[in-house]
Amino acid sequence: EYYYNDILTGTDGQMIMETGLGGTPIAGGTSEVTEAQDGTDIMLSIDIDLQEEAERIIAEGVETYQSESGSVMVSDPKTGEIYAACSTPLPDFSNLTDSSSLDLKLVSQSYEPGSVFKVITTSIGYDLGLYTPDTVYNVPARYTLGDNYVQDDDGRDYAEDMTVRYMLQHSSNPAMALLANEVIGPKRFAEGVEKFCIGQKTGIDFPGETAGIVKSYDEYDGTTAGYMAFGQSVAIPMIQIIRAFAAVGNQGTLTTPHFLIAKAGEKVDWPSGGQAIS
C-alpha cells in the first residue's frame, strides 16, 4: 500500500473566494470550487490464507533452526503474480514503532544464494546444447579454484562419474565448478547469468528493491565462474532467485514479480522480462 500510496490517496476539495478585510465573503465576488477526488481502487494478488500459512511456516522455521531471519514467497511462475510474501521479524500492526519489521528482506537485502544457484548453472549449459541430463562427467573429489579447492560434504576422496542430473540431485559443488569452468566456460557462463537478469532489479512493485552485487565478465578472475556456479562470489536478493526459478518453469520466459493485478477496475498488464533460456 505504501508503494501505491499516491494513487490510493484522494485529494481534498477546496473553495477559493474573494473576501473583505475581515474575512467575510464579498457578495458577487470571485469564487472557485475544486471538487474532492476519491483515491483509485486497486486489487492485489495476495491470498490471505496462503499469506497466513507462509507467515506461520517461516516463523516456526526460524525458531526451530535458530536463524537470524527468514523469508518466503509464493508466486505464479507464468504470470509473476505474488500470492504470499513475508520476512521475519513479522510486523506487529498493533505496534509499528519498529518500522524495520515492514521491510521485505527478500526484496531489499542481498545474500549469497548458495546451492539454489545450481539450477541456473545447469540450465545455462543445457540451453546451449552442451549436455543432456544424462551426460556423464568425471568429477574429482576436490576441484581446485585458485589457491583453494572445493569438495562435497560426503567425504568422497576419489573421482566419480556423475550425470548432470545426479550433480544437481546431490548438489555437488565440484561438479558445478567443473561445468562452469570447463564445459560452459566463464564467458558463456557470464552471458547466461546476464540473460537470467541476475544482478538487475526485477521491477517488483515493492519499495526498497536492491540489484545486488554481481561481477561482469570483465571483472572475472580465474575462480569467479567456479564459485558462482554453486552460489558463492555473488550477492543478490531472494526475489531474483524466485524469478529465475519461475523462468525455468515458464519455458524460459522471465516475468515481472508483482502484487498489483487491477487498478480502477481494469487489469494491469506487466511486461515480460525477456527470454532467459529457450
Q: For each of these PLM feature ranges, what is it?
A:
Residues 1-71, 91-94, 100, 264-274:
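Extracytoplasmic/periplasmic proteins that interact with beta-lactams or build/remodel peptidoglycan
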Residues 20-33, 76-114, 120-278:
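Beta-lactam-recognizing serine transpeptidase/beta-lactamase-like catalytic domain environment
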